[in-house]
């Protein structure tokens, strides 16, 4: 087993708005191969992620990852959304506390250039081009299915607000529900629906969903 703690690679982009809180956010992609047992701590002024990689053929060591970022400005922890996709990338969407048109000049509070933090140019748009890009339908969150992300730093009780249409397969939403996603959302929300009423007819390759432990 490897005892070395590794800083994972981070890519980030952002949007800003003076009037719309939903368009005032930071997107972070953390790269951790074979991500396992993630533990996320979200505070207004910082985020911290701990995880490990599972052993596999050719590398039987367990690698430990840790990321701590003191953010340039405060965020709203309870609105944070996060998800592990394919066991390779940890996606986070952080909502900025202050509504303002100016971009953050950097992700971190410290004016230090960290070698493992990069700009995500695939999602980056200049401040004066935000409205134009959005009008063209080019979302900053391309490739991230935020409808299936886990929200908040502490979780919310009840099944209210769950969009079950997002879990339906087939044309026009007429297919069978995605049982793994349904069970995951119910587990997060404390729902008590009778799963016996649902039958899965089609087997599809799905993203590996790993529910992190989140600390408020």
Curated annotation (Swiss-Prot):
GO biological process: chaperone-mediated protein complex assembly; positive regulation of telomere maintenance via telomerase; protein folding
Annotated region (Disordered), positions in chain: 169-216
Family matches, as CDD domains: p23_hB-ind1_like
Native source species: Saccharomyces cerevisiae (strain ATCC 204508 / S288c) (Baker's yeast)
Molecular function GO labels: Hsp90 protein binding; protein-folding chaperone binding
Cellular component terms (Gene Ontology): cytoplasm; cytosol; nucleus
Biological role stated in the UniProt entry: Acts as a co-chaperone.
Annotated protein name in UniProt: Co-chaperone protein SBA1
Taxonomy of the source species: Eukaryota, Fungi, Dikarya, Ascomycota, Saccharomycotina
Subunit composition and interactions: Interacts with HSP82.
């Amino acid at each position: 087993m490897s005892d070395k703690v590794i800083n994972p690679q981070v890519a980030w982009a952002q949007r800003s708005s003076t009037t719309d809180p939903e368009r005032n956010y930071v997107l972070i992609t953390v790269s951790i191969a074979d991500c396992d047992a993630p533990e996320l701590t979200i505070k207004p002024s910082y985020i911290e992620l701990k995880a490990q990689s599972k052993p596999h053929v050719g590398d039987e060591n367990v690698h430990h990852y840790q990321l701590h970022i003191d953010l340039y400005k405060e965020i709203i922890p309870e609105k944070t959304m996060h998800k592990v996709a394919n066991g390779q990338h940890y996606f986070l969407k952080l909502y900025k506390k202050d509504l303002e048109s100016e971009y953050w000049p950097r992700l971190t509070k410290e004016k230090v250039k960290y070698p493992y933090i990069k700009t995500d140019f695939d999602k980056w748009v200049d401040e004066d081009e935000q409205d134009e890009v959005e009008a063209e339908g080019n979302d900053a969150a391309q490739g991230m299915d935020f409808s299936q992300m886990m929200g908040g730093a502490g979780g919310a009780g009840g099944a209210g607000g769950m969009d079950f249409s997002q879990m339906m397969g087939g044309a026009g939403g007429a297919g069978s529900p995605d049982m793994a996603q349904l069970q995951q959302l119910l587990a997060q929300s404390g729902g008590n629906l009778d799963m016996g009423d649902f039958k899965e007819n089609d087997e599809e390759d799905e993203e590996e969903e790993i529910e992190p432990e989140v600390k408020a």
